[in-house]
Design a protein with these regions (language model features):
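Conserved N-terminal structural module of periplasmic/extracytoplasmic solute-binding proteins
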Residues: 4, 28-108, 122, 242, ...
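C-terminal lobe and pocket-closing loops
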Residues: 264-278, 283-383, 414-415
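A structural signal for short loop-to-beta-strand junctions that line the ligand-binding cleft
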Residues: 85, 93-94, 114, 123-156, ...
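Paired acidic/hydrophobic, glycine-rich loop segments that form the ligand-binding mouth/hinge
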Residues: 94-97, 259-264, 278
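Hinge/lid segment of periplasmic solute-binding proteins
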Residues: 99-151, 163, 168-174, 200, ...
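Glycine-centered hinge/linker elements that transmit conformational signals in sensory
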Residues: 174-175, 215-242
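Bacterial N-terminal signal peptides
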Residues: 11-25
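Extracytoplasmic/periplasmic solute-binding protein
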Residues: 141-147, 152, 170-216, 222, ...
Length: 417
């Protein structure tokens, strides 16, 4: 190159100008060859800071390959609709983060998520905690890499509860002692009229939303049995507040008027600084033969957009995000529950009581269904829950109505495909 430049300088102005033009063309080509990957997410606060730190670390390393990574935080309320609208039209991100409950709908709708089984190697498959990769699988095809998980667990006020209950019998006995409804104090508080929270109790009985097919079974006998136990906790044992909104539950716990709650990691940020709290496994259910409560797992995955023009580079980024190195930052700094099992061998994670507690709860949790049909289950199930707890219908009647409603909606959904 030095000889070429010297000849150009000695060759006079014409040759020099020509040489400058050639070098400029090379620079333009090099710039055009650079790859920019765009990642969408909905994180805020510590999660956002940790995620962007991890992406920046990757971007620095990938710069040598001509790869630059940018991130965009999308408000959660508009996030799913934005993906559904943008990606099939060839717009939007190369990579996006979202929970598994929308996966089936996106696959059935087409041109949103890219199958990634072709890229997956055995080492990557084996690095995840149990049930994680399965949540990213739809009709035997893998569409995403699992990034983090969330579930509910038992959170208790240490000032009021010395030893957390291990069984439903212990739970009710302790909660009764700590309840004074007239004074607005309750032994237990959780959003029991929300089907997501109720699923933990339902699953203990062997209940479920769907049988294989998927076939909806909201009216299954096990679901009815779970609802009857919930009604006992509300009416006979009287250990739960009426109208359990998230705002009420937070207020009760922070005022020392709720000794225990069933909730997830999102609740911890709402706990007042002066509350000394602990976490424990959800209790086993005596009425279900001693089976554990099995909360639903919400598993966020890293998806490669079907419209991305650089799918291989996008997958390599996704693979890094689920690595041990990235996972340690996302877990320790972002307070996420990463899916890479090696992360939990690090002292900073293993010695953290909050992270360790949610990791223990994982062993008795189950992934939330990712069927397309799941989207039409929520409204009828929620209506049934509210009807039952208000006493407007028996569990048998309300769940049968919900079953018929879901069957009708699923038939319409499948007809429209």
């Amino acid at each position: 190159m030095r000889r070429i430049l010297l000849k150009a300088m000695l060759g006079g102005p014409t040759l020099w100008v020509a040489m400058v033009m050639v070098l400029g063309a090379w620079a333009v080509q090099a710039q055009a060859a650079a790859t920019t990957l765009t990642v969408w997410h909905a994180y805020r606060g510590k999660e956002k800071a940790a995620f962007e730190k991890v992406v920046a670390n990757y971007s620095k390393r990938a710069a040598a390959k001509g790869i630059e990574v940018t991130t965009l935080a999308v408000p959660y309320d508009a996030y799913a609709d934005k993906i559904t609208a943008a990606v099939p039209r060839g717009k939007g991100p190369d990579v996006f983060i979202f929970a598994q409950d929308r996966l089936g709908g996106w696959v059935e709708g087409g041109v949103t998520v890219e199958p990634i089984g072709f890229f997956l190697d055995d080492q990557t498959r084996s690095q995840f905690l149990p049930n994680m990769l399965e949540a990213m699988t739809y009709r035997d095809t893998v569409y995403g890499l699992p990034l983090n998980y969330k579930s509910i667990t038992l959170i208790y006020n240490k000032k009021l509860v010395a030893t957390p209950p291990k069984t439903s019998g212990e739970l009710v006995k302790l909660a009764k002692r700590l309840t004074d409804a007239a004074a607005g104090r309750f032994g237990l508080a959780y959003a029991y009229n929300d089907f997501y929270y109720h699923a933990a109790l339902q699953n203990a009985f062997g209940g479920r939303a769907f049988d294989p097919g998927p076939k909806p079974v909201l009216n299954a006998p096990q679901n009815i049995a779970a609802m009857k136990l919930l009604l006992k906790w509300i009416r006979q044992d009287a250990i739960l507040p009426a109208e359990p909104s998230s705002a009420l539950i937070t207020s009760l716990f922070n005022e020392g008027k709720a000794a225990m709650v069933f909730s997830g990691p999102w609740f911890l940020g709402e706990i007042a600084p002066g509350i000394d709290y602990g976490l424990a496994l959800l209790p086993t259910i005596d009425e279900a033969g001693g089976k554990p409560m099995r909360p639903w797992l919400t598993i966020e995955g890293v998806y490669v957009s079907a419209s991305s023009r650089q799918k291989e580079a996008a997958y390599e980024l996704a693979k890094y995000l689920v690595s041990e190195e990235a996972g340690l930052v996302l877990t320790v700094e972002g307070r996420q529950l990463h899916t890479n099992k090696a992360v939990y061998t690090h002292k900073a994670v293993a010695d953290d009581p909050v992270l360790a507690a949610f990791r223990r709860q994982l062993d008795s949790a189950t992934p939330m269904p990712n069927f397309a049909e799941m989207t039409v289950m929520w409204s009828p199930a929620t209506t049934a829950m509210n009807t039952i707890v208000r006493g407007s219908a028996t569990p048998e009647v309300a769940l049968e109505r919900a079953q018929r409603s879901v069957e009708k909606d699923i038939a319409a959904l499948r007809k429209g495909r």
